[in-house]
Amino acid sequence: MSMFKEFRDFAMRGNVVDLAVGVIIGAAFGKIVSSLVANIIMPPLGLLIGGVDFKQFSWILKPADGAAPAVVMEYGVFLQTVFDFVIVAFAIFMAIKLMNRLYTKKEVEKPVAKPSAEETLLSEIRDLLKEQNGKAQ
């Protein structure tokens, strides 16, 4: 089997294609959440705290020295990233919870199958044999 054919077979399996679609949608969803946090959630939150822009929160570890730039720890950007993570994690949690609920409903709604004619006959034979063995003793 040629390497190209093996790769094609691998890439066209359902799981790989589904995974690729999931990664692409996840990346797009991540951008939406980042925009939501940076442009919608953080500005009003900063306003409530007193007109604070979280992106400006930083510690200067070493000031700029001539041509060397300052060494800065930008914890405000980190806080925004934490908000991004919490929102994405909550959205994934809700999606999984919904999927689990739908899955359990399908299991509950599954009707109990009636025994086949063969199973019914075998059950009757078993019961008769038990009855005969009980009388013999």
Swiss-Prot record:
<dbReference type="InterPro" id="IPR019823">
    <property type="entry name" value="Mechanosensitive_channel_CS"/>
</dbReference>
<keyword id="KW-1133">Transmembrane helix</keyword>
<feature type="transmembrane region" description="Helical">
    <location>
        <begin position="10"/>
        <end position="30"/>
    </location>
</feature>
<keyword id="KW-0407">Ion channel</keyword>
<dbReference type="Pfam" id="PF01741">
    <property type="entry name" value="MscL"/>
</dbReference>
<comment type="function">
    <text>Channel that opens in response to stretch forces in the membrane lipid bilayer. May participate in the regulation of osmotic pressure changes within the cell.</text>
</comment>
<feature type="transmembrane region" description="Helical">
    <location>
        <begin position="76"/>
        <end position="96"/>
    </location>
</feature>
<dbReference type="InterPro" id="IPR036019">
    <property type="entry name" value="MscL_channel"/>
</dbReference>
<dbReference type="InterPro" id="IPR037673">
    <property type="entry name" value="MSC/AndL"/>
</dbReference>
<dbReference type="GO" id="GO:0005886">
    <property type="term" value="C:plasma membrane"/>
</dbReference>
<comment type="similarity">
    <text>Belongs to the MscL family.</text>
</comment>
<comment type="subunit">
    <text>Homopentamer.</text>
</comment>
<keyword id="KW-0406">Ion transport</keyword>
<keyword id="KW-0813">Transport</keyword>
<dbReference type="InterPro" id="IPR001185">
    <property type="entry name" value="MS_channel"/>
</dbReference>
<keyword id="KW-0812">Transmembrane</keyword>
<dbReference type="GO" id="GO:0008381">
    <property type="term" value="F:mechanosensitive monoatomic ion channel activity"/>
</dbReference>
<keyword id="KW-1003">Cell membrane</keyword>
<protein>
    <recommendedName>
        <fullName>Large-conductance mechanosensitive channel</fullName>
    </recommendedName>
</protein>
<keyword id="KW-0472">Membrane</keyword>
<keyword id="KW-0997">Cell inner membrane</keyword>
